Amino acid sequence: MLFDLFKALVLGIVEGVTEFLPVSSTGHILLAERIFDLDQDNFWKTFAVLIQLGAILAILAIYFQRLWRVATHMFTDPAARRFVIGVLVAFLPAVILGLIFGTFIKEVLFNPWVVCFSLIAGGAVLLWVDQQDVNPRHHDAMAFPLPMYLGIGIAQCAAMVPGVSRSGASIVAAMLFGADKRAAAEFSFFLAIPTMLGAFVYDVYKSRGDMTMDHAFIIIVGFVVSFITAIVVVKTFLDFVTKNGFTFFAWWRVIVGTLGLIALALGA
């Protein structure tokens, strides 16, 4: 029991730290499960899905006032309505491709080798984009043009490959379309809400047979840890990238991916 609580604590921290950073939470969770030898355990796979809700609620808590204003004014305020439409437009590509290829991706691509190669490749792309000398044109994540929302949504589909990073793909796309670094990061948070909620509901429905009340306390621990960690990380992350960009996270990806490949090659 104590070791299970320790695993729940570690996985909750990993989820909360990595979910909204451009480093791939799925990739890090898969590697953590490999370290604890949990990658074939159905309960822990379900646990990894459930604790995502803690991270989602962290975003809702941080941006509650802005999101509440959008929700209460979307029928009277054109700007609020355009933002809601933009998020839905960005969300749809992942829904369509997820329904078509979701099972194939989980059965074929969810393995540590793919994760490690994706971490390295994504790190190289993030490093390249971060070092481009561009003059950003868009500074408000709630006021991007509709075609830009669609482009970000299409780019986010790359994150169906574990290790790519949902937030990383959307941040890279937003910056290439002319968003400043803070706005790119913030929109990745907003887009995460429907994307992660949709994936959460779908995965919970499919995994409902693997959950029992015997696991309730372990799940609560992971959920709370994920929520608290995500709040701290998101608030710190925005200030950090505004001042320093994404180079640190690009090298984080490359180093973790490289160490993972070495460990796998040695039979870990």
Curated annotation (Swiss-Prot):
Protein's UniProt keywords contain Cell wall biogenesis/degradation: yes
Keywords annotated in UniProt: Antibiotic resistance, Cell inner membrane, Cell membrane, Cell shape, Cell wall biogenesis/degradation, Hydrolase, Membrane, Peptidoglycan synthesis, Transmembrane, Transmembrane helix
UniProt protein name: Undecaprenyl-diphosphatase
InterPro entries in the cross-refs: UppP
Gene Ontology biological process terms from the UniProt entry: cell wall organization; peptidoglycan biosynthetic process; regulation of cell shape; response to antibiotic
Catalytic reactions on record: di-trans,octa-cis-undecaprenyl diphosphate + H2O = di-trans,octa-cis-undecaprenyl phosphate + phosphate + H(+)
Stored PANTHER family: UNDECAPRENYL-DIPHOSPHATASE
Superkingdom, natural source: Bacteria
Residue ranges crossing the lipid bilayer per the database entry: 43-63, 85-105, 108-128, 141-161, 184-204, 217-237, 246-266
Annotated family: Belongs to the UppP family.
Remaining remarks: Bacitracin is thought to be involved in the inhibition of peptidoglycan synthesis by sequestering undecaprenyl diphosphate, thereby reducing the pool of lipid carrier available.
Biological source species: Afipia carboxidovorans (strain ATCC 49405 / DSM 1227 / KCTC 32145 / OM5)
Topology with respect to the bilayer: Multi-pass membrane protein
Pfam families documented for this protein: BacA
GO (cellular component) term, any one: plasma membrane
Disulfide topology: none
Documented EC number(s): 3.6.1.27
Subcellular location as annotated: Cell inner membrane
Originating gene: uppP
Molecular-function annotations in GO: undecaprenyl-diphosphatase activity
Functional note: Catalyzes the dephosphorylation of undecaprenyl diphosphate (UPP). Confers resistance to bacitracin.
